[in-house]
Amino acid sequence: MFQDKGWVLLTLITLVSPSWAAYKLQERYSWNQLDFAFPNARLKEQALASGDYIPQNGLPVGVEHFGNRLFVTVPRWRDGIPATLTYINMDRSLTGSPELIPYPDWRSNTAGDCANSITTAYRIKVDECGRLWVLDTGTVGIGNTTTNPCPYAVNVFDLTTDTRIRRYELPAVDTNPNTFIANIAVDIGKNCDDAYAYFADELGYGLIAYSWEQDKSWRFSAHSYFFPDPLRGDFNVAGINFQWGEEGIFGMSLSPIRSDGYRTLYFSPLASHRQFAVSTRILRDETRTEDSYHDFVALDERGPNSHTTSRVMSDDGIELFNLIDQNAVGCWHSSMPYSPQFHGIVDRDDVGLVFPADVKIDENKNVWVLSDRMPVFLLSDLDYSDTNFRIYTAPLATLIDNTVCDLRNNAYGPPNTVSIPKQTVLPVGPPLYTKQYRPVLPQKPQTSWASSPPPPSRTYLPANSGNVVSSISVSTNTVGPAGVEVPKAYIFNQHNGINYETSGPHLFPTLQPAQPAGQDGGLKTYVNARQSGWWHHQHQG
């Protein structure tokens, strides 16, 4: 039937390749339950007996890498959390389930010792000046059980000396009774003193800016973009349906410095499928807190099942973000329009990436992802005989390879024009200039998995049998009356664009090899092995 037997073999390999072939994130550490590095066995036994340490009550939520240390935060949502800011010595523990070491020491993790310690930390950030930024929420408990023994305080540590070099309490005017801050972004300008931190007030619906040089903070709160979308409060994770309808501004990322000397802050409310943005020129100016409404820009929705809590952008403009409904990590290259065909999925795993709570890119452009099954922990019961918490890593270049986010080898690139910036309510402008790309490839390169050894830590999903595949539906762009394209949002990247369902490549190569008689000749079907985000191409008769 087929004259080219080699083509048949390649197609069969694509269809029946084992599930590990789709994975690029590699598991580095994992735990059934968290363990801590007590000074000695006797003190650990005392903590277990007194309830100061309850292994089943710990949930990791934040991760950050610096040198030979991998930092992990454990909020004090329940009793029995001996330390909230911890790290793994990566020289001593290359893999496995290492004990978490309190940072910088045990005393600095004493709950309620406001001036000297950290009570609860969530997501943290290391800047390029070797400083670790930690916001202590000062809280114990979660939801209705929350108490506030300490005020919100910014803590900054010098990672070369492991000493705290700054503690700044947020003034009462910068918070409100509903304030809950779980995310931080750090903006370094001309030098290490020209530093700002931005804090997302998820339940108080505000954005707080802090100046290192001035040692002062101010709050932006008069903006509806910080609020949840009332239509996007329904969640489905790990088979659990729940409603987080009050969750406002949450995930944030910062662009590289623009030509005007400022960055762009991108952010999303948790109960939303939409991304927003604002220049740090506005956020750095205390006088603009009540007079900046029109300086914030709305991008369109990402599409269904696209809630996100964490995002990060590399210094060359590649944004990674978690997709908690999809057990996946997505990507977008910020030099491209913010539209669905320029969003990709770099990895998906319905076992290992259940609630990928935090995503980071370190100084060496390695990506770190922490998954923790948070909704199961909060709303149901974890099985502590199973692996519940994982930390994955991979080089950024490896993750985006052969995705729409990899512009170095992208046969599915956009038209070589950039539009005049417009708000979403205005028509798309004419081309401003021609954007230069590398020559378009005649055909998307095929990836051969046959010679790749399976990663030993990613073998828990069974392989497909026969030629069974899972299909992915690709949403089309929205059009208005008479086929006119809906105006797209623009934000500091010289493009109009929307964000819809994360999807695979949106265009086919213009040049196709000759096909046997009776075949269509085009690349007709995107298929997805083991529900991963990596696209495998096949010809169908």
From Swiss-Prot:
GO annotation, biological process: cuticle pigmentation; male courtship behavior, veined wing extension; melanin biosynthetic process; regulation of adult chitin-containing cuticle pigmentation
Subcellular location: Secreted
This protein's record includes keyword Zinc-finger: no
Signal sequence region: 1-21
InterPro entries to which the protein is assigned, alphabetical: 6-blade_b-propeller_TolB-like, Royal_jelly/protein_yellow
Glycosylation sites (chain numbering): N144
Family statement: Belongs to the major royal jelly protein family.
Function description: Controls the pigmentation pattern of the adult cuticle and larval mouth parts.
Protein name, per record: Protein yellow
Species of origin: Drosophila yakuba
Encoding gene, per UniProt annotation: y
